[in-house]
Amino acid sequence: MTRSTDTLRGLATRAIHDGQHPDPTTGAVVPPIYQTSTFVQDGVNQFREGGHEYSRGSNPTRNGFEEQLASLEHGTRAFAFSSGMAAEDALLRAVLQPGDHVVLAADVYGGTFRLVDRVLSGWGISHSIVPSASADDAARTVRPGSTAVLWLETPSNPLLRVADIAAWARVADDAGALLVVDNTFATPALQNPLTLGAHAVAHSTTKYIGGHSDVLGGAVVVRDAHWRGETLAERLAFQQFACGAVAGPFDAFLAARGLKTLPLRMERHCSNALEVAHFLRSREDVVEVHYPGLEDHPQHDLAAQTLHGGFGGIISFRPAGGVRAAHEFVAASELYNLSVSLGGVESLACVPHTMTHASRVGTAYEVPEDLVRLSVGLESIDDHLADLDRALGAASRVGRRDVPSVGGARQQAA
């Protein structure tokens, strides 16, 4: 759905109003959920207002959410899918063909790596991994004539590396390739990759956009760009309709409702996370903290330039006691529920090595076994700090007790 052309209004105003117009028939302030599979025609191929025929092709609830998200990302069109991985799969299949080469930043989400490494490789798509977030390293990884996509996640999952999107975009342009940025962690409340030169943005709307851990979804937002004789929007629209992994009306409604409060929620996620990061940094029983809001983060200055309004709600750290201490910490915490996924109002913790990045185990890009990822929620900051203090205290005494398992390689989610 094409977004509003009014880009002068503030982020919070657009989040609430773009694509979310009162119902013209009843005057309902909140647009209704069009929970329907098909639409009545007044005659053969004579469609009513909106041109809706079948909900796989278009649905007013989904289209409204797509317009809303496109506005926040400063894109020309957005496309909503049934999951973040469905969105990534649709985007890559829309632009790639056998013989193409994909460049992946080292710290991309494990599911993205698995999709490219184990699924697309069977269709003649090769890939290389950049050993860092550096655009110079990305340029050296490009294969002239065959590299079609550069895929970047910034801040990255789970090590919170920050990349220079504009520099990566120049590398992509020089290679005649597309730059895709996974903006799930930053969200359009903090970062707009399309304005920095990216061609497309991918989201797991399950995370901060939905924001309440009650919906599964994904989205792709594109700017006005052409690829192999068609616009990116045309390619994505065909892929969405032809393959059908669309967001259902109720899921689109939940995502749209979450998006309305995204700017406000991200303020609290960011402020809580910054305090938690400083708290962890001050502890002798924590040996490493990854958060771009910390001044000693290697890309702090870059993060301050590219992220506006905060540094995000995700932190990762390594306790002094190693993997057993990491397992004890997540078992002992009462506020941070042990779970995959992130971005909800409630706080979550996980051990990425076996819970979210198991596809990396045994590779050069395996994440540390003792790394703990925190999705810092909206609870009172005093409760965060008290709970972390208790859980870290338990982790420091890990040698006195058995440590429960937190999962195995079978798990692989956000």
Regions found by a protein language model. Give the residues of each.
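N-terminal glycine-rich, Lys/His-bearing helix-loop that initiates the first secondary-structure elements
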Residues: 1-51, 289, 400-414
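Conserved PLP-enzyme active-site core in the AAT-like
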Residues: 2-7, 24, 78-285, 290, ...
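C-terminal core of ALDH-fold dehydrogenases
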Residues: 15-29, 324-361
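Conserved N-terminal alpha-helix of the aminotransferase class I/II PLP-enzyme fold
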Residues: 38-89, 111-118
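Short loop segments at secondary-structure junctions
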Residues: 38-39, 222-227, 259, 319-322, ...
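PLP-dependent enzyme catalytic core of the Aspartate aminotransferase-like
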Residues: 117, 126, 331, 347-414
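Short, well-ordered beta-strand elements within core beta-sheets of diverse protein domains
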Residues: 254-264, 312-320, 373-377
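Conserved small-domain helix->loop->beta segment predominantly found in fold-type I
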Residues: 274-334, 338-340, 359-363, 400-407
